């Protein structure tokens, strides 16, 4: 933290007018309610997922769509003209139906809801701006970032990259309970601003697995390959269940003790690509509407830890967000001039699933699940082949995390239960990558 001091809208000012603002949003959210934002969030999540899978079809995937959306929406406060339009439409908002101010008000409402203390489920999310000490930021941009996204602001000396890197990494580590310790490995001296968004999730299964029942078992990577992994087991579990015959997959929902749940999608052998191609907001709604409590005689789920790193500046253009990374970028609402562009967006996620619960940092994760199927004959569900996972907040219907488990053995650590996905934006001539959710970096053009 040495060499850095809080800026105008640092943490102590975050609550200024916040309660009144939240009440106003709660009373006036008509164009953008939680369901509208949830639908856009899900649409973006599935679109990004398909791009990630397209590049690495047989690898694990873990990311926090909500964290990435929040970071980009916050950055859009500083964008104008086509740059602004591309960001918001890339996040799957219909600007004809949903005006830009309503989008930001909706995020403010959701961020406040998620920050409320819950019953045994801890969700912590926040944003921070690290600004080059000589860079003049418009007061309007800083105030909107504080009021709408609860963003803290700090000055940093990017001419001393080691000190600036330590400042940012310490901030992220402190706010993700140490789950993400090195978001950034180095910083370019041309960096002018780094935007960080983090999300930390920790929950306990309503029906935890018994560690004594966990044993090594086969996980089939494909028709010809398998690995031995720790397999958790729970018997006689009643939980929401749906068999989707059209898409050839089984859907099970495992609930946490608070306002969160994990949905597991198990495609039939050889049907993963069919399910992935069908991922749409309507698909998720159909699954949720079709889930019914069923008795599952035996449910087996791998105990695992997986992690991923993504440079999103190479992927977001496929979703229509292009100008942000070019010399045509208009981020003049940040400084008053068109002298900034985004050089890099990095997303890092860690997901651990174990018997008792889930812990995540700026990302997604969940543990201990249970499910059931109401049928006359014995029902057994084995997650012994690649499957999908979606962790959602049940109050807002927001998809906090999404994952594809292709190989539970890809990481060595199977013991802890945690998820980490911070998001950072760095503003500089070339986008700088960071470890955790999403990191946009801004540099001078």
From Swiss-Prot:
<keyword id="KW-0646">Protease inhibitor</keyword>
<feature type="site" description="Reactive bond">
    <location>
        <begin position="371"/>
        <end position="372"/>
    </location>
</feature>
<dbReference type="InterPro" id="IPR042185">
    <property type="entry name" value="Serpin_sf_2"/>
</dbReference>
<dbReference type="GO" id="GO:0034097">
    <property type="term" value="P:response to cytokine"/>
</dbReference>
<dbReference type="InterPro" id="IPR000215">
    <property type="entry name" value="Serpin_fam"/>
</dbReference>
<comment type="similarity">
    <text>Belongs to the serpin family.</text>
</comment>
<dbReference type="GO" id="GO:0009617">
    <property type="term" value="P:response to bacterium"/>
</dbReference>
<keyword id="KW-0325">Glycoprotein</keyword>
<feature type="region of interest" description="RCL">
    <location>
        <begin position="357"/>
        <end position="382"/>
    </location>
</feature>
<dbReference type="GO" id="GO:0043434">
    <property type="term" value="P:response to peptide hormone"/>
</dbReference>
<dbReference type="InterPro" id="IPR023796">
    <property type="entry name" value="Serpin_dom"/>
</dbReference>
<feature type="glycosylation site" description="N-linked (GlcNAc...) asparagine">
    <location>
        <position position="259"/>
    </location>
</feature>
<dbReference type="InterPro" id="IPR036186">
    <property type="entry name" value="Serpin_sf"/>
</dbReference>
<feature type="glycosylation site" description="N-linked (GlcNAc...) asparagine">
    <location>
        <position position="94"/>
    </location>
</feature>
<keyword id="KW-0722">Serine protease inhibitor</keyword>
<dbReference type="GO" id="GO:0004867">
    <property type="term" value="F:serine-type endopeptidase inhibitor activity"/>
</dbReference>
<dbReference type="GO" id="GO:0005615">
    <property type="term" value="C:extracellular space"/>
</dbReference>
<protein>
    <recommendedName>
        <fullName>Serine protease inhibitor A3F</fullName>
    </recommendedName>
</protein>
<dbReference type="Pfam" id="PF00079">
    <property type="entry name" value="Serpin"/>
</dbReference>
<dbReference type="InterPro" id="IPR023795">
    <property type="entry name" value="Serpin_CS"/>
</dbReference>
<dbReference type="InterPro" id="IPR042178">
    <property type="entry name" value="Serpin_sf_1"/>
</dbReference>
<feature type="glycosylation site" description="N-linked (GlcNAc...) asparagine">
    <location>
        <position position="174"/>
    </location>
</feature>
<feature type="glycosylation site" description="N-linked (GlcNAc...) asparagine">
    <location>
        <position position="28"/>
    </location>
</feature>
């Amino acid at each position: 933290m040495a060499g850095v001091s809080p800026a105008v809208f640092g943490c102590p000012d975050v609550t200024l007018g916040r309660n009144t603002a939240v009440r106003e949003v709660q009373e006036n959210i008509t164009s953008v309610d939680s369901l509208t934002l949830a639908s856009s969030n899900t649409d973006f999540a599935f679109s990004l997922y398909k791009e990630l899978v397209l590049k690495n079809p047989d690898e694990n995937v873990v990311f926090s769509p909500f964290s990435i959306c929040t970071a980009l929406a916050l950055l859009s406060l500083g964008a104008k003209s086509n740059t602004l339009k591309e960001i918001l439409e890339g996040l799957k908002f219909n600007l004809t139906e949903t005006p830009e101010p309503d989008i930001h008000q909706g995020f403010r409402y959701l961020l406040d809801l998620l920050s409320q203390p819950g019953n045994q489920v801890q969700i912590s999310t926040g944003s921070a701006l690290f600004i080059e000490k000589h860079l003049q930021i418009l007061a309007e941009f800083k105030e909107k970032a504080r009021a709408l996204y609860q963003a803290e602001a700090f000055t940093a000396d990017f001419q001393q990259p080691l000190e600036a890197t330590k400042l940012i990494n310490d901030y992220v580590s402190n706010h993700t309970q140490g789950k993400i310790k090195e978001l950034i490995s180095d910083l370019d001296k041309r960096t002018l601003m780094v935007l960080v968004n983090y999300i930390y999730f920790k929950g306990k299964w309503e029906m935890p697995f018994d560690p004594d029942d966990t044993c090594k078992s086969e996980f089939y990577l494909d028709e010809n390959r398998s690995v031995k992994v720790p397999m958790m087991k729970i018997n006689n579990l009643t939980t929401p269940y749906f068999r989707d015959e059209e898409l050839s997959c089984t859907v099970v929902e495992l609930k946490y003790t608070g306002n969160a749940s994990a949905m597991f999608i198990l495609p039939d052998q050889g049907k993963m690509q069919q399910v992935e191609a069908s991922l749409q907001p309507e698909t998720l709604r159909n699954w949720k509407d079709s889930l019914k409590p069923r008795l599952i005689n035996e449910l087996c789920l791998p105990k695992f830890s997986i992690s991923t790193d993504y440079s999103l500046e190479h992927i977001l253009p496929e979703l229509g967000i292009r100008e942000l990374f070019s010399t045509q970028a208009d981020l003049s609402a940040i400084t008053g001039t068109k002298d900034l562009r985004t050089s890099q967006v990095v997303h890092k996620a860690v997901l651990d699933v174990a018997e008792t619960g889930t812990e995540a940092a700026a990302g997604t994760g969940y543990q201990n699940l249970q499910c059931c199927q109401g049928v006359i004959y014995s029902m057994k569900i084995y997650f012994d082949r690649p499957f999908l996972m979606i962790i959602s907040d049940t109050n807002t219907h927001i998809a906090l995390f999404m994952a594809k488990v292709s190989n539970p053995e890809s990481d060595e650590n199977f013991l802890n239960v945690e998820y980490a996905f911070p998001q950072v934006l760095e503003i500089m001539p070339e986008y700088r990558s960071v470890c955790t959710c999403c990191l946009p970096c801004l540099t001078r053009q």
